[in-house]
């Protein structure tokens, strides 16, 4: 009986320990996951809205350029490069989550036509692998292999990202035709201003939540500020919390208005989107074009030879 109770007690303790460890893991792991742009895709079934806007712009509010380079035409079942460039000043530093300054990271989303997908590793040439570096690409959804995401990765090393793409073959995929297709791209540099849950990051401007007089500013030990504002209308005290990172622009005793910036804008990054076009070319059409061009060349050569032969005949008749 005592042995059975001992085993029961041990079983309960093991179960309780596992539960505690699982809860601790979830608590610690969740903020880290939410910090990565790739996890924001859980909120959107498709990264490109009906208006053409890519949803990454909901978190990265500043508008910045992005460029994409793809071949004009590709043949079926071939691997080609889609090069995405995310330019920015390599000298600038961004505000990190802890308020310190650090290098910018970059990320990108590539929306390909249906049927196009990430090339298998065994189909990628050594030249393309060298350009790819150590990047790891993922599908936006398991069912959407034509939408690829990457990042965040160090911007100083990967401001130019090479995607290895495999073109579809209409002979094996009846949903694909030999047509001109659009390709859409979105690229960001630096941290966003809004988290996926809608809360503001410290990479943001913080404004006054009321108008009045700044009564007190407390600098916190771990960084950031606690600003007490005496409301001008009823005299009540309103406390605005500023996280570590943004620089304070106001001082005690200063009169401020509603929505007046209390801090500078620390954001040095931003998001941009662009597009390109690619033609999935029919090999038979290419062969037909080559045959047509070759026939024209041979016809021209034949005419030149005939002309010279005619001139020789005329010259011989004149001499006769």
UniProtKB/Swiss-Prot annotation:
Membrane-traversing stretches: 286-305
Single annotated GO MF: heme binding
Highest taxon of the lineage: Eukaryota
Cofactor comment: Binds 1 heme group covalently.
Coiled-coil regions, chain positions: none
Pfam families xrefs: Apocytochr_F_C, Apocytochr_F_N
Residue sites binding heme per the record: 36, 56, 59-60
InterPro entries: Cyt-f_TM, Cyt_f, Cyt_f_lg_dom, Cyt_f_lg_dom_sf, Rudment_hybrid_motif
Record's keyword terms, sorted: Chloroplast, Electron transport, Heme, Iron, Membrane, Metal-binding, Photosynthesis, Plastid, Signal, Thylakoid, Transmembrane, Transmembrane helix, Transport
Signal peptide positions (record): 1-35
GO terms (BP aspect): photosynthesis
One GO CC term, this protein: chloroplast thylakoid membrane
Main location per the UniProt record: plastid
Cellular localization per UniProt: Plastid, Chloroplast thylakoid membrane
Membrane topology, record value: Single-pass membrane protein
Cofactor(s) required for function per UniProt: heme
PANTHER family in the record: CYTOCHROME F, PTHR33288
Function description: Component of the cytochrome b6-f complex, which mediates electron transfer between photosystem II (PSII) and photosystem I (PSI), cyclic electron flow around PSI, and state transitions.
HAMAP family assigned to the protein according to its UniProt record, in alphabetical order: Cytb6_f_cytF
Family: Belongs to the cytochrome f family.
Subunit structure: The 4 large subunits of the cytochrome b6-f complex are cytochrome b6, subunit IV (17 kDa polypeptide, petD), cytochrome f and the Rieske protein, while the 4 small subunits are PetG, PetL, PetM and PetN. The complex functions as a dimer.
Name assigned to this protein: Cytochrome f
Annotated organism of origin: Lotus japonicus
The organism's taxonomic lineage, starting at the top: Eukaryota, Viridiplantae, Streptophyta, Embryophyta, Tracheophyta
